[in-house]
Curated annotation (Swiss-Prot):
<comment type="subunit">
    <text>Heterotrimer composed of an alpha, a beta and a gamma chain.</text>
</comment>
<keyword id="KW-0560">Oxidoreductase</keyword>
<dbReference type="GO" id="GO:0016491">
    <property type="term" value="F:oxidoreductase activity"/>
</dbReference>
<protein>
    <recommendedName>
        <fullName>Formate ester dehydrogenase gamma chain</fullName>
        <ecNumber>1.2.99.-</ecNumber>
    </recommendedName>
</protein>
Length: 24
């Protein structure tokens, strides 16, 4: 699963497991 996260104007694209999203 590829996600793009925008933090403080900086974009991070990473391959993460679905469970990782639940931590936030």
């Amino acid at each position: 699963m590829r996600i793009t996260v925008n933090v403080d104007g900086t974009s991070y694209t990473d391959e993460v497991e679905p469970r990782t999203l639940l931590v936030h």
